């Protein structure tokens, strides 16, 4: 019934198994991949014919984590998986980026890849396995895919590169780098690092590329016995149309791309495009020689070639800069004075308004992942409204691109954040991209660094980011610093590097062609370092470090520690005690399992009142000390006084006053404020208090003549 095939190799000290032929047999390609005991199922379906009118490749990648994979049941009312989590979105992008450039040029058939985590051993992250499984499924599917692709994670632990570290090992690593590519070339890099140098980062990329070669060999071995017949597909040849178009508008298009202002340039390009459409419009009653989609597609190709030729031939770019010059930068802080911290970072025609907000433990984000629940205290949200590029468009929840760009900036900043002990605040940063012409994610990095320092967050060092590009034709190439949007779309590489003056904290690379050598990557990294140092210098005109004090409107947090066996006393039955403290003092209180108590308020008096209240609950009263208390109950034999937080004690009728007392109510009534001295505890542990030894007017102990005391005791 099943035509099963299986390949197994040892990879990174664990078995990697690729299986096909048993599950999801109606998909064009399906592979069940196992690494350690983590399993993912990758499926590929590509329609037999393209939809008419498409001028792009409709590829969709859906990565999904099923909670049953880790033996869990989803939370929420419906108890089933819902919208994609942030990690699912990020891994979907991670899979998409290295495979997209490898589909044949001109292939526009609707293609969907679904990757499902069906088992998680809580040791091996399924993201790398998902790249491998997808590559294998595509290689078997028969679609025109120029793979296979391999992928690997690289850590840097105790001064050595580690291939595919376990999840718990990553806590010790100074590097979290994912690299993917073919047997000959690197296509994608995604990383977070703790201020590592350029040479070390490049070494990690090459180590990872070498590390996944056995995976590519295993996929080829599986394809030799299980691959479907390749589909008949011939890339359309539009060279004749391109030649005609070049004759008609070649010079005009070249001149349009010499206009430095973005809006004026776009208007000139649109005018050229309109001329092209008019030139190829059929006469009345005639069939068109080319479809509008073909004309549009070839015009895009011609745009790319014109820009690329100009750069390679002249060394001059669209906006007139040379290859290494960074656009003019203006950095401002405190632009929104009532917020906790704010910055406006402008680089050429790219601008980010970034706002930092300080919160308490209550504001931490709870994340329920397959590996368990954890709390995130640093949040970074990137928004890209359509007005930033002079367009109208959809507004609403963030798309994949916005989530991905926000995470890239988050990775760049996180290594420089203070520890929770040093700065016990939850941090939320929002980057509003108000203008965009390339490199908005790196503007977010710069703006975030400034906004956090403006808020008084003690970053270890300021962080800046720069986006690099590449134009390569044959042996000729040009590496571009601080790329524009057009240079990103029409170039061969998008290489984003963020870091401090001392090293790299985040690196992301996407390459659209094969043949990017180690030499080119080294040039790009070195050029990016120069650009980063320049940007840090420009940012320093606004701020060089964190402000010494928090903003006027930011909450203050003080931390105290209590014994863990006292936590229940502070919280009270059903939260009664802590609610009362919050209501009466106005402070916010967060208690950790280890006894750490964080008290937050913008009012110092509220914090002090809450601290004092909690202290009285957890501290033990000392014998011989005098306390102020409140009479809570009277009886024939004395009065009960609440004198130390929730603690009550008895003042016996004989201890109410120095003279003989007939009735308790003659001396005190419920609600009276009194001073009491803790005399000790009886044999049952009950508190013994005295009022008569304390001056009720001053709260001071009454000093009596020792000889008189002796005579009184004898009597």
Swiss-Prot record:
<dbReference type="InterPro" id="IPR015848">
    <property type="entry name" value="PNPase_PH_RNA-bd_bac/org-type"/>
</dbReference>
<dbReference type="GO" id="GO:0006396">
    <property type="term" value="P:RNA processing"/>
</dbReference>
<comment type="function">
    <text>Involved in mRNA degradation. Catalyzes the phosphorolysis of single-stranded polyribonucleotides processively in the 3'- to 5'-direction.</text>
</comment>
<dbReference type="Pfam" id="PF01138">
    <property type="entry name" value="RNase_PH"/>
</dbReference>
<dbReference type="InterPro" id="IPR004088">
    <property type="entry name" value="KH_dom_type_1"/>
</dbReference>
<keyword id="KW-0808">Transferase</keyword>
<dbReference type="Pfam" id="PF03725">
    <property type="entry name" value="RNase_PH_C"/>
</dbReference>
<dbReference type="InterPro" id="IPR001247">
    <property type="entry name" value="ExoRNase_PH_dom1"/>
</dbReference>
<keyword id="KW-0479">Metal-binding</keyword>
<dbReference type="InterPro" id="IPR020568">
    <property type="entry name" value="Ribosomal_Su5_D2-typ_SF"/>
</dbReference>
<dbReference type="GO" id="GO:0005829">
    <property type="term" value="C:cytosol"/>
</dbReference>
<dbReference type="InterPro" id="IPR003029">
    <property type="entry name" value="S1_domain"/>
</dbReference>
<dbReference type="Pfam" id="PF03726">
    <property type="entry name" value="PNPase"/>
</dbReference>
<dbReference type="InterPro" id="IPR012340">
    <property type="entry name" value="NA-bd_OB-fold"/>
</dbReference>
<feature type="binding site">
    <location>
        <position position="494"/>
    </location>
    <ligand>
        <name>Mg(2+)</name>
    </ligand>
</feature>
<dbReference type="InterPro" id="IPR015847">
    <property type="entry name" value="ExoRNase_PH_dom2"/>
</dbReference>
<feature type="domain" description="S1 motif">
    <location>
        <begin position="624"/>
        <end position="692"/>
    </location>
</feature>
<feature type="domain" description="KH">
    <location>
        <begin position="555"/>
        <end position="614"/>
    </location>
</feature>
<keyword id="KW-0963">Cytoplasm</keyword>
<dbReference type="GO" id="GO:0004654">
    <property type="term" value="F:polyribonucleotide nucleotidyltransferase activity"/>
</dbReference>
<feature type="binding site">
    <location>
        <position position="488"/>
    </location>
    <ligand>
        <name>Mg(2+)</name>
    </ligand>
</feature>
<comment type="similarity">
    <text>Belongs to the polyribonucleotide nucleotidyltransferase family.</text>
</comment>
<dbReference type="GO" id="GO:0000175">
    <property type="term" value="F:3'-5'-RNA exonuclease activity"/>
</dbReference>
<keyword id="KW-0694">RNA-binding</keyword>
<dbReference type="InterPro" id="IPR027408">
    <property type="entry name" value="PNPase/RNase_PH_dom_sf"/>
</dbReference>
<keyword id="KW-0548">Nucleotidyltransferase</keyword>
<dbReference type="InterPro" id="IPR036612">
    <property type="entry name" value="KH_dom_type_1_sf"/>
</dbReference>
<dbReference type="InterPro" id="IPR004087">
    <property type="entry name" value="KH_dom"/>
</dbReference>
<protein>
    <recommendedName>
        <fullName>Polyribonucleotide nucleotidyltransferase</fullName>
        <ecNumber>2.7.7.8</ecNumber>
    </recommendedName>
</protein>
<dbReference type="Pfam" id="PF00575">
    <property type="entry name" value="S1"/>
</dbReference>
<dbReference type="Pfam" id="PF00013">
    <property type="entry name" value="KH_1"/>
</dbReference>
<dbReference type="GO" id="GO:0000287">
    <property type="term" value="F:magnesium ion binding"/>
</dbReference>
<keyword id="KW-0460">Magnesium</keyword>
<dbReference type="InterPro" id="IPR036345">
    <property type="entry name" value="ExoRNase_PH_dom2_sf"/>
</dbReference>
<dbReference type="InterPro" id="IPR012162">
    <property type="entry name" value="PNPase"/>
</dbReference>
<dbReference type="GO" id="GO:0003723">
    <property type="term" value="F:RNA binding"/>
</dbReference>
<dbReference type="GO" id="GO:0006402">
    <property type="term" value="P:mRNA catabolic process"/>
</dbReference>
């Amino acid at each position: 019934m099943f035509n099963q095939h299986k390949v197994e190799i040892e990879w990174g000290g664990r078995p990697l198994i690729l299986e096909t032929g048993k599950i999801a047999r109606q998909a064009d390609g399906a592979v069940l991949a196992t690494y350690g005991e983590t399993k993912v199922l990758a499926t590929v379906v590509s329609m037999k014919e393209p939809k008419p009118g498409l001028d792009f490749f409709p590829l969709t990648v859906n990565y999904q984590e099923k909670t049953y994979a880790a033996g869990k049941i989803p939370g929420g009312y419906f108890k089933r998986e819902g919208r994609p989590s942030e990690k699912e979105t990020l891994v979907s992008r991670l899979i998409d980026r290295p495979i997209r450039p490898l589909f044949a040029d001109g292939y526009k058939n609707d293609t969907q890849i679904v990757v499902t985590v069906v088992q998680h051993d809580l040791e091996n992250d399924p993201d790398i396995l998902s790249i491998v499984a997808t590559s294998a499924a595509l290689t078997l599917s028969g679609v025109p895919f120029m793979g296979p692709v391999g992928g690997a994670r690289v850590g840097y632990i105790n001064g050595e590169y580690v291939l595919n570290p376990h999840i718990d090992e990553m806590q010790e690593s100074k590097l979290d780098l994912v690299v993917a590519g073919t047997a000959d070339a690197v296509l994608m890099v995604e990383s977070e690092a703790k201020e590592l140098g350029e040479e070390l980062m490049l070494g990690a990329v090459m180590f990872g590329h070498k590390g996944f070669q056995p995976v590519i060999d295993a996929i080829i071995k599986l394809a030799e016995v299980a691959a479907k017949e390749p589909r008949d597909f011939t890339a359309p040849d539009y060279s004749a149309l391109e030649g005609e178009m070049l004759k008609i508008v070649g010079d005009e298009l070249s001149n349009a791309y010499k206009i430095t202002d973005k809006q004026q340039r776009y208007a000139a390009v649109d005018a050229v495009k309109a001329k092209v459409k008019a030139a190829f419009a059929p006469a009345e009653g005639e069939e068109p020689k080319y479809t509008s989609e073909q004309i549009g597609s070839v015009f895009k190709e011609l745009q790319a070639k014109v820009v690329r030729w100009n750069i390679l031939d002249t060394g001059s770019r669209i906006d007139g800069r040379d290859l290494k010059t960074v656009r003019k930068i203006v950095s401002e802080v405190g632009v929104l004075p009532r917020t906790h911290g704010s910055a406006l970072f402008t680089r050429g025609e790219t601008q980010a308004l970034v706002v930092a907000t300080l919160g308490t433990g209550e504001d931490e984000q709870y994340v329920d992942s397959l590996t368990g629940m954890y709390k995130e205290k640093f949040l970074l949200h990137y928004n890209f409204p359509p007005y930033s590029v002079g367009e109208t468009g959809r507004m609403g929840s963030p798309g994949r691109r916005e989530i991905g760009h926000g995470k890239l900036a988050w990775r760049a900043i996180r290594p420089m954040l203070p520890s929770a002990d040093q700065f016990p605040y939850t941090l939320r940063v929002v980057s509003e991209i108000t203008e965009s012409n390339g490199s908005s994610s790196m503007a977010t990095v710069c703006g975030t660094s400034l906004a956090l320092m403006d808020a008084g967050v003690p970053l270890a060092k300021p962080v800046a980011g720069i986006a690099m590009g590449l134009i390569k034709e044959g042996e000729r190439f040009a590496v571009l610093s601080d790329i524009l949007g057009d240079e990103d779309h029409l170039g061969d590489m998008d290489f984003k590097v963020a870091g401090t003056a001392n090293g790299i904290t985040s690196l992301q690379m996407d390459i659209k062609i094969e043949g990017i050598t180690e030499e080119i990557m080294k040039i790009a990294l070195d050029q990016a370092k120069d650009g980063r140092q320049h940007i840090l210098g420009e940012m320093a005109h606004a701020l060089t470090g964190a402000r010494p004090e928090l903003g006027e409107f930011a909450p203050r947090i003080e931390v105290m520690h209590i014994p863990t066996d006292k936590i229940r006393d502070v919280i009270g039955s059903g939260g009664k005690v802590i609610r009362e403290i919050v209501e009466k003092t106005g402070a916010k209180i967060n208690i950790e399992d280890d006894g750490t108590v964080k008290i937050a308020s913008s009012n110092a008096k509220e914090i002090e009142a809450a601290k004092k209240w909690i202290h009285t609950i957890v501290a033990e009263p000392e014998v011989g000390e005098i306390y102020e208390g409140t009479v809570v109950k009277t009886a024939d034999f004395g009065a009960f006084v609440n004198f130390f937080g929730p603690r009550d004690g008895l003042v016996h009728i004989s201890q109410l006053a120095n003279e003989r007392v007939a009735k308790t109510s003659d001396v005190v009534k419920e609600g009276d404020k009194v001073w009491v001295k803790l005399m000790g505890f009886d044999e049952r542990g009950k508190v013994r208090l005295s009022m008569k030894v304390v001056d009720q007017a001053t709260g001071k102990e009454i000093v009596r003549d020792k000889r008189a005391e002796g005579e009184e005791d004898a009597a």
